[in-house]
Amino acid sequence: MINPISFRPGPVTFWTTLIYLALLIPIVIINEEPPAAPKTAEPFKGVNLTEAWLDLTTITRAYHPYNSKFNEEVRRYLLEKVESILEENGATWVFDDQMAAAAKDGKSAAVTVFDDNVSNSTFVMGKSNGTTFTRTESINNAAYFEGTNILVYIRGKEDDDGDWWEADYVHGMRRNAKGLTLVNAHYDSVSTGFGATDDGMGVVTCLQVLKYFTTPGNQPQRGIVVMLNNGEEDWLYGARALGQHKLNPFIHTFLNVEGAGAGGRAIVFRATDREVMAAYARTSHPFGTVIASDAFGMGFISSGTDYSVLVDAYGQRGIDLAFFKPRARYHTNQDDTRHASKESLWHILSASIHTTKQLSGDTGNTFIGQRPDKAHGKVANGRPSNGVWFDLFGKSFVLFGLRGMFAWSLTLLIATPLILVGITWLLRNLDKDYFFTSTVKTKEHPEYEAVPIGGWKGFFRWAMMVSIFYFSFWMIMRGANFVRPSALHRGYANLWLFVFGWIVLVAVTALEDRRRIAAGYIFVFLESAIFLSCLISFVELLALPRKSAYALQVQEDYDGHDHSGYQGYRDSTDGLSSGARAESSASAGSPSSPTVAQEPSKPTAPAGTTNGLSTAPSVAAHSSQPQPAPATPTPGRSTSAPIPSTTPRDEDESEDDDDEATERTPLVGGNGTNDRGRTTFATTYRRSITALVHGARKMEEDGEPYEHEQDWSGHLPSWAWFFQFLLLGPFMIILAAQTGLMLTDAVYQTGSDGSKLFTPYLMIFFFTLLLILPLTPFIHRVTHHIPVFLLVVFIVTLTYNLIAFPFSANNRYKAFFGQYIDVATGENKVCYTGIEEYVRPIIAELPSASGRDVTCGKSLRRGSTIATCCFDGSAVPPKLGSEDLDGLPQDNYADIITVNATRSHKKGDSSRTTARIEITADNTKSCFLQFKKPVSALTIESGSGWDDRFGQYPEDGVGLVRLWHREFDKTWVVNAEWKGSETRKGDDENDGTVICMWSDANTPGTIPALDEALQFVPSWAAVTKFSEGLVEGRKAFKIV
C-alpha cells in the first residue's frame, strides 16, 4: 500500500492541489461577495436596516454636489431625519443656539444638534498648474470655504454636564478630559454620480449610529459626535471647516465612513495606530490589511479622504473605513442604489456601530495624555503605538504591535542562521552532512576511489526559477529532476528560499525600525515558515547512514559484484577450459585484476597461466557473502577510474603487462595465439564505482530511493515533505491570495484615472510569485496534468486578453468631461480627458462633434499617458444663468460674471499695492480667482483668518484662490496685496482672471453637452467630471 503522504508524484499532486483549491475558492468568494444581510429589518435594538436603505434611496435620487440645488434639499432632509430619530427614541435634545434656555431648567440635554452655517476656513492648498482654461506654471493655491456641516453631540455617561465646550465654561481647566469620538461621513456627491456608496451609505450609517446610541439603554460611556459634512468631493472642504467648530478640540478619536468604489465589502483603508484597530478587530466580518495603510503613507495611493485632514491637521486618531471597488462605477451614474446592495450597507453599518461602541467605551488612558510629538494646535490624545493587522477569510482579525514584529524579525535574522549552522555542525560530526558533499572516501581504504554521494545535485536549480510561475516552475524543475535526479532538491529549494527570504527580511526589518512600515509582515511570516521547513530538511538527514558507512557498503558491494560476476560467468562457459574460464573471470574486473577494457593484455602469458590464459585468483574469502545483481549505469553519470590493485598477484600481472603490444595483441585482452576464448567485449568490461553505486540499493530493506535519485535517499522519511508544505503553504496562500486580490481590485482600473499602468501588473506579478512560492520545493514531484492544464488556461486567456476589447458595459472606461466658455468672447469648447486611443472613439459618437476638428494635447492634471481632446462646443451651449429662457439656448454669457477690481495703496508705504476685488456670479456657489502675479497677502471679507494647521502662507505668494459660498449668487470680496515697486494705471502686471463653476446637471438641458454624452457614448464608456465644475466660465479683469 502506498503511503498517502509519501513524497511521490501522486500524493504530492493530490495534496498540493487540494490545499490550494480548498483555500483559493473561499478566498475568491469572500473577496467578491459581502456577508449576507440579516433577514430581519431590526437585527438588534436601535438599528433598522430597512429604514437605512430607504434613506439611501431618498438622498441619491439626483446628483447632489455642493454646488447644486439638490444638495440643499439633501441637507434639509438630513436635519429632519435627525429630529425624527431623536423624537422617536424619546431623547432630550436641543439645537446649540437653545442651550442657554435649556440650562435654566437645570438639566443637560442628552443630545445637542449643531446646524453649522457659521464655520468657514481660509487655508493654503499646495501647488497646481491653474485651471483647465488658465494653464500656467506651477503656482501656490489657497481656498476660502463656507461650511454647512451638521453635527450631533451625544452626551456620554462620563461627560461633563452642561455646554462644557463653550470657552467661558471653566477658565483654566481642561473640560471633558476623556475626549469625544467622531463618526464622520459626507453628504455631497460628485456632479456626475448619485453617491450611493460615495458617500450615501456612510451618511445613512451615521444616521443609524445616531439612532443606536440614542436608543434607551445604549448611551455611550464617552461622548460621540456624529458629523454629516458637506464639500468633501472637491478638496475635503467639510473636514477643513470642522477645524473652526467649538467641538473639534475635544475630539480624540474618529471613524471616517467613506466610499472609493461602488459596493462590495468595506475595507479598513488606513488607521493611525494599533489601539484604534483594537476597537475594530472584533467586528463580525473584519476586512483589511496594514499594507493598504502603509501604501497611503508611502504615497503609492494618492486618493484623499477626510482622514487626511483629521489626522494631519488636527492630530486625531482613527480609522478610514471605505468601499474600494469596483472603480469603474466610482464617480459615475452607476454609483446608485441599483448597483449597490443591502449586504454592502450591512457590512459597513455593523462594523461602524461596533467600532464606535469600542472607541467611545474606552474609559482608560488609551486616548488621553501628552502627545509624543508635542505638536502645538493638535489634540492631546495619548501615545499611539504602531500596529500590524490583517484579516483571515473576512471572519477573524490578526492584530499585534510593530515593535513585537521588529523583535521577531531581528530574532529571525540573527538566530535562524546560527541554528542552521549548528545543525550543520552536528550533521558533520555525525558524518551525515549530505548537503554540499559530492564524494566521500572510506577511512578503511583511503586508496580506493571516492564514492559519489551526489550531495550538490539540486543546489543551483531553484535560483533560476524566481521570476516564473507554476508551469514554468514545474517544466524546468521536472526536467532537471529527470536529467539529474536528486533527493536533496527539496532541501536545497528550502535553503534557497531561506537565503533569499533572509535578504528580504533585512530590508523589511530596517523599514520596521526606521520608517515604521508594517507592510512587510508577510515576509516575516514567510521567513519563519521557511526556516522551520529548512530545519526539517536538515534534521531529516539524521535518518541517513553515515557517509563513511555508505561508502564502505558501496565498496563491499563493488567487491562482491566482481566475484559473483565471475561465478556467474564460470557457470555459463561450459565449452571452455578451466583456464579460459579463469581468464574470463579475470577479465571481468575483479579487485585483483587490471581493467582490460582500458588496457589490453600482453601476448606473453605470465606465470600462473595455462595455455596462455590467466589463472583465476581465489575467491573463497568473498563467496559466502550475498551480493546484488549489477545495475545499469544511469545516463548522465560519469564513469570513474578503477580501484587500484593491492595484491601481489596484481603486481606480477602489472609487471607482465608492461610488455610492449604488437600487431598480434588482441584488442580486448588475451594473446595472439588463443583469442577465441573471448566471448564478447561486455564480458571483459570493467565496471566503475559510479555504476556500482546503484548496487547499494538493497543494502537496507527499509526504503527504496525514488526512481534514479541517490541510492542512500531511500532512508529519508517520505512523509517529511507533507509537514514542510503545511508550514509553507496554507498560511502563506491565505495571506498572498486575499491580499493580492484585494489590492488588485483596488488599483487595476486606476489606469484611466492617470495612474501608472505598470503598478497593477507589478502587483499581480508580486503576489502571484508569493502564491506559488510555497510550492517550489515540491513542484518537481507534481504530475504533468496540472501544469499542462494551466498551460492551456494560460494560452486561452492570453489569446482572449489580446483579442478582446478591454472594456464592457459592466466594466466601463471612464472619460473625464468638461466644458469651457470665455464669457466675454463666447468661445465654447467641450473637452474629454483620458487615454487618446479610447477618447477619440467616444467623441466620434457625439452628434455635436460631427464634422468638427478634434485637437488633443497632454493633460496637465493627470498622468503622462492621459490626453485632453477638445472640439468646438457651440452646438451645445449650456444654460448657466438663473433666468428661465423658455427652453432656448443661452447665447450671451457676458453678464453672468461681474468683476470689480480697484487699486489702492497702504498709507505711508508706496512700495505695496493693494486691490479690492468684488466677484458676483449668477447661479453658482464657486468661483476661482487667478492672478498674473502672485499676491503676497490675501484676506476674504467676512472670512476667518488663515488656518496655519494647513500650512503657512507661502513666501512666494499665492497665484490662485478658490472661493466657495454656502449660498447662491452671493458676492465675494477679496483684498489682495503685492510687494514691489508701485505700478501705474494701465499696467497689467497685477491683473487676473475669474473662473466660475457650474455643476448642477439634474435638470435636462442645463448642460446639453453632458446630456448628449450620457445618451450617445458607447456602452463601454462612462463619463465623469474632470474638475470642480462641469462647466467653467472665465472672465479676465484689470485693476483700475
From Swiss-Prot:
Residues 31-405, 457-462, 512-521, 737-758, 807-1040 are vacuolar. Keywords: Glycoprotein, Hydrolase, Membrane, Metal-binding, Metalloprotease, Protease, Transmembrane, Transmembrane helix, Vacuole, Zinc. Residues 636-647 have a biased composition (Polar residues). Its cofactor is Zn(2+). Zn(2+) 2 binds at residues 198, 233, 331. One of its GO terms (cellular component) is vacuolar membrane. Signal peptide: none annotated. It comes from the Eukaryota. InterPro entries: Fxna-like_M28_dom, M28_fam, Peptidase_M28, PFF1_C, PFF1_TM. Residues 1-9, 427-436, 484-490, 543-715, 780-785 are cytoplasmic. The chain crosses the membrane at residues 10-30, 406-426, 437-456, 463-483, 491-511, 522-542, 716-736, 759-779, 786-806. CDD domains: M28_Fxna_like. Residues 650-661 have a biased composition (Acidic residues). The active site is at 232 (proton acceptor). Binds 2 Zn(2+) ions per subunit. Zn(2+) 1 binds at residues 186, 198, 258. Glycans are attached at residues 48, 117, 120, 129, 900. Residues 577-594, 616-626 have a biased composition (Low complexity). Its EC number is 3.4.-.-. Belongs to the peptidase M28 family. May be involved in vacuolar sorting and osmoregulation. This is Vacuolar membrane protease. It comes from Sordaria macrospora (strain ATCC MYA-333 / DSM 997 / K(L3346) / K-hell). The lineage of its organism: Eukaryota, Fungi, Dikarya, Ascomycota, Pezizomycotina.
